[in-house]
Amino acid sequence: MADRLIVKGAREHNLRSVDLDLPRDSLIVFTGLSGSGKSSLAFDTIFAEGQRRYVESLSAYARQFLGQMDKPDVDFIEGLSPAVSIDQKSTNRNPRSTVGTITEVYDYLRLLYARAGTPHCPICGEQISRQTPQQIVDQVLVLPEGTRFLVLAPVVRTRKGEFADLFDKLNAQGYSRVRVDDVVYPLSDPPKLKKQEKHDIEVVVDRLTVKIAAKQRLTDSVETALNLADGIVVLEFPDDHDERGHPREQCFSEKLACPNGHPLAVDDLEPRSFSFNSPYGACPECVGLGIRKEIDSDLVVPDPDRTLAEGAVAPWSAGRTAEYFTRMMAGLGEKLGFDVDTPWRKLPAKARKAILEGSDHQVHVQYHNRYGRPRSYYVDFEGVLTFLQRKMEQTESEQMKERYEGFMRNIPCPVCQGTRLKPEILAVTLAAGERGAKSIAEVCELSIADCSAFLNALILGVREQAIAGQVLKEIQSRLGFLLDVGLEYLSLSRAAATLSGGEAQRIRLATQIGSGLVGVLYVLDEPSIGLHQRDNRRLIETLTRLRALGNTLIVVEHDEDTIAHADWVVDIGPGAGEHGGQIVHNGTYRELLANKDSITGAYLSGRESIATPTRRRSVDRKRELTVVGAREHNLRGIDVSFPLGVLTSVTGVSGSGKSTLVNDILAAVLANRLNGARQVPGRHTRVTGLEHLDKLVRVDQSPIGRTPRSNPATYTGVFDKIRILFAATTEAKVRGYQPGRFSFNVKGGRCEACTGDGTIKIEMNFLPDVYVPCEVCQGARYNRETLEVHYKGKAISEVLDMSIEEAAEFFEPIIGINRYLRTLVDVGLGYVRLGQPAPTLSGGEAQRVKLASELQKRSTGRTIYILDEPTTGLHFDDIRKLLNVINGLVDKDNTVIVIEHNLDVIKTSDWIVDMGPEGGAQGGTVVAEGTPEDVAAVPESYTGKFLAEVVGAGCAPARTPRRRRTVTA
């Protein structure tokens, strides 16, 4: 049927021969517990088959250049359209990619500036233009009649040389005079120039007086000068002097030229001239990157409260040379009047400058040799900054280079100030009335909302309007789509590598809407990630607009509002992993609310909920972590305190500065001080309260491994203990097997036919590569001899094939192993197989594996945990389990800080730091802080407005739209 999408017998991963009938041209939401099979059905089955069919429709020649996709394990799919996947995994890490380039807005801006921009001289700011010989003559003839002037052809501009050959050549061509460095000489007796000095040479083509009768002679002279000087002619007016007493000059050019005669290197403006990825436009200093690495004194002296003897100067505080450098600084102290036991911040400015930049004087270094005899010598004191720069240039060791780079920070290029473009390109502007004239770099620095407003206000002439009208329409269309998905706070110059997964996904979503495709199947992975509740409405409107074009949308989502606005909802479950893979509900949202078998329906209808705590943990304001003077990115020099021993949620709209504050500054400082890392923190003054902590644990949703060889058992370390246990069996001891025998990563115990993979890859040339079970080990990964060793009747491969829940029961008597496995069960991963390959784990599952790995370590009560949107990919019931784990950590007096938008997590927090009020330049401040009840009472807080609806109540049912599309079952 043309209006249906029918799936029969889907068995990918944990799917249990699923049959599904979906309406086309609809917004369909797939929901269910984490690991229930949503992504397996949406991405690995429906999208994979749609993509595969499209690729196979191409010629064999074309297919060899495209990534082939495996045929999913499904009987058949009917009514399938060409499929486009919009996920969160393909964030661009290229330093040259920006929001402007990946949305193609920058391409249109380049075209706009090339065709309608007004060029100026980058030196004096005067407008520059090109003119024909006729236009030049017409401008001269409007001068008062009788005005005397010389027609000069500048053949040399600020170049070194004697130029004797040039003078001879000009003399032979019939020219009689030449002006050299503002002095006129006859070519019959030219000056002898100094070879090592720069000179200006102009040929005197003619002497004329302004009068109509001389028009033809003037035209001939101007054309001669233009031909002689490569398109430039200079007129000197001997009777009219400037403020310095020099004769006034006027420069004309067939090319772009400064009217004040400043030398320019501007060719005809083309779109490539505005590209920082092209040599025609890129700043020559930074080759279009906009940044360069430079040693930062704040990183060299990270803790100004330390003394020099205590290691205040970080590069000189570690290793065997620390004592040598301390003695050297003591010698400098004798000369400048300070001692090494004074804290850095209390040292005189002159002393700090000398330590950093070096001293002109030799310093007297005194020490005792190994026999206790006093010794001394004199040495030049080069300064720590010079020392680091020299070492950086000299070393060939990657390890040492990495160490020195730890004291360097990316700073804007000093030539282009981070704009990436040449000065002459930055001098091309477009004017927008009261908003002023802006270069392409200045427009890209604006937020998308301000950029749209600026382009709307452009003042263009009739000619420019005719040229730029269509280009502006394309730009505004794309900017409008970015605004619709809640990205108004981003700038077009924002580096793609700094975007979160949610931001990158919404940019791709906006790009797809701009493409205007019809009849496409879009598969999206949680587009609401990283989006504040305030912006959800615009995202939903964007999705419905994409559907209205005539497309089918399948959205894997847990957000209540998105589910409530769906035309059709598929709930997959009932549990996760082996307990999931079935269709629990396939119908409308209202039918889902009434479905007694659906745990999703139970939470959405209010039958189940995550309760608001009846009492919150008390906050001790004397025990807190404080970031002072945070000013990285859009943070406005703010001071923020995080109470210790409680659960703190950092909230705020997208782009308000949450990740910058917590990840770029706080977590980086903690990692350096507590874990011995060498990260470069964002700009701030200091962080206080570190003495209350002894360890940092960061948990995000990045994969636990990139290859199938990584799995929950190897990541948590429990596999090492299992291998030791197998090596301790009687059979293993008889055979002399060590724990390494039971590893599938090294020779000895693994199957060498498949090198421990369990599968063999068969290349099929024009067809996708086929993976088949290894014929030797039948997918077990180990050789026959290793598999003959059993523990309680199970071989090592059979243990890896157990679910974690089964394994916990199997190893119950072995406390060291059971403790690891019980922790994985506690975070809701009992359904996952112990040896399940890491690439098959969802983001939520990977995060919980990491959390479990940390949980099984013994707690000191002085650990701080930082989690970045831990609810990503988690169902309501998964969130409940996660909160139980987090609260267990806090109950042991540890500190947990989460960056979060989910109201269930926020309402159960003990403390909230709400950033805002808006995103981008309008953000970067603390709007509210306190308990959830305190924040809910702050009218300026967007988070507070939504929090007020749920604080003190259970999980309220999602608001349903007033009007809904009718979908036939």
UniProtKB/Swiss-Prot annotation:
Disulfide links within the chain: none
Subunit details: Forms a heterotetramer with UvrB during the search for lesions.
Originating organism: Mycobacterium leprae (strain TN)
Tree of life domain: Bacteria
PANTHER family per record: UVRABC SYSTEM PROTEIN A (PTHR43152:SF3)
Entries under InterPro entries matching the protein: ABC_transporter-like_ATP-bd, ABC_transporter-like_CS, ATP_grasp_subdomain_1, P-loop_NTPase, UvrA, UvrA_DNA-bd, UvrA_inter
Protein name: UvrABC system protein A
Role according to the record: The UvrABC repair system catalyzes the recognition and processing of DNA lesions. UvrA is an ATPase and a DNA-binding protein. A damage recognition complex composed of 2 UvrA and 2 UvrB subunits scans DNA for abnormalities. When the presence of a lesion has been verified by UvrB, the UvrA molecules dissociate.
